[in-house]
Regions:
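Extended aliphatic helical segments
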Residues: 18, 27, 38, 81, ...
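Structured soluble/peripheral alpha/beta segments that form catalytic or ligand/cofactor-binding pockets
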Residues: 35
C-alpha cells in the first residue's frame, strides 16, 4: 500500500491509501474514475506518494511528481494490480464505473532507511 497525496479544489491536501505497482522504473496506480483523488489529479496533476515499509517504519520512499492518467476500461492494468494484492478490483467498483491507470512521473525521490 501507498499513501497518495493530492490537492483538492480548495488547495487543501487529500490523503488516500492506494494499491500500486512498481515496474520499469515507474510507479503506477489503478484508480476508479468516480473518486475525488482522480478529480483532483485531473485538475492538478502534482502529487506525492509515500510508501512505508510496514516491517520497518523507519524505512520509506517518497515520490513527488506529476500524474499521467490513461484510460483502463478493460481492467488490463487494474487486473495486474489486483493480482499483487490478491483481490479483484471489480469487487470495489459499482456497475458502470470505470478505471484509469495513473503513472506518477517523478520530479523528486527521497528514501530513508
Amino acid at each position: 500500500m501507498a499513501t497518495l497525496a493530492t490537492l483538492g479544489e480548495d488547495g487543501r491536501p487529500q490523503l488516500s491509501e492506494v494499491w500500486f505497482l512498481a515496474e520499469d522504473d515507474q510507479v503506477r496506480l489503478s484508480l476508479n474514475t468516480t473518486r475525488q483523488k482522480v478529480r483532483n489529479l485531473r485538475r492538478r496533476p502534482g502529487c506525492s506518494l509515500l510508501i512505508l515499509d510496514l516491517a520497518n517504519p523507519y524505512r520509506y520512499l517518497e515520490i513527488r511528481g506529476d500524474a499521467e492518467i490513461t484510460p483502463d476500461p478493460d481492467y488490463l492494468f487494474a487486473d495486474r494490480v489486483g493480482a499483487k494484492y490478491q483481490a479483484d478490483p471489480r469487487d470495489m467498483d459499482q456497475p458502470g464505473e470505470t478505471r484509469v491507470a495513473v503513472t506518477v512521473r517523478p520530479h523528486r525521490i527521497r528514501a530513508w532507511g
